Amino acid sequence: SLMTQIQRAYQRAHPPLKKQLVATTTKNKRLRVGFAGAYWKRHSVCKLLCGIVRGLASLDDFEVVLFDATEESDDWLAWTLGTGATHRPMDMTLSSRTQVQDVDILVYAELGMRARALTWAHARLAPVQVLFWGHPHTSGLPDSIDYFVSSDGFEAPNDDLSRRYAEQAVRF
C-alpha cells in the first residue's frame, strides 16, 4: 500500500526508527496495557477511546498506562485517569525500554497526527501492538503494528480488509 511505501521510506531515511526492542514483560497476574497518543483531552480521539481506557482501568485484571505525546491536560484527561490509569509522557529517544513500562499490549490511539506517536510506532516496544481507529487508516507498518481495530460501522460487510490494512484488521 501507499502508506507502507511511505513508512519504509521513513525507515530508510532514519534507520533508528525501525528499532526492534526485546519485549519483556513481568509475569504479573494483571495484563499491562499501554495506550499511546496525543489526544487525552477534549478531542474526538479521546471521545472514541477514553471510555474504553477508563473501563479497562477499572477492572482488576488490567493495569493501564497512558503515554502522552503532549503536556496538555483538561477535565477529560482527569476523567480518563479517574479509575486508576497511570499517566506518563512519551519519550522521543526510544532508547529506554523502561519508558514503556514493560506493557504486554501497546495500543496507539491514532497515528499520523503527531510525529511522536508515529516515531514510536516504527519500533517494536511491546509483544503486541495495536492501532485503534482514532485516525482510521492503516499505519503502513506491518512489522511493528500487529492489529488495526476497526468497526462494523466503518467497513462494508463483505469487504476484504487485508486490501486496505497492512495490519491484521479486527472488527470491534
Task: Locate each region found by the language model.
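Alpha-helical solenoid repeat scaffolds of the TPR/TPR-like class and their adjacent stem/linker regions
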Residues: 1-171
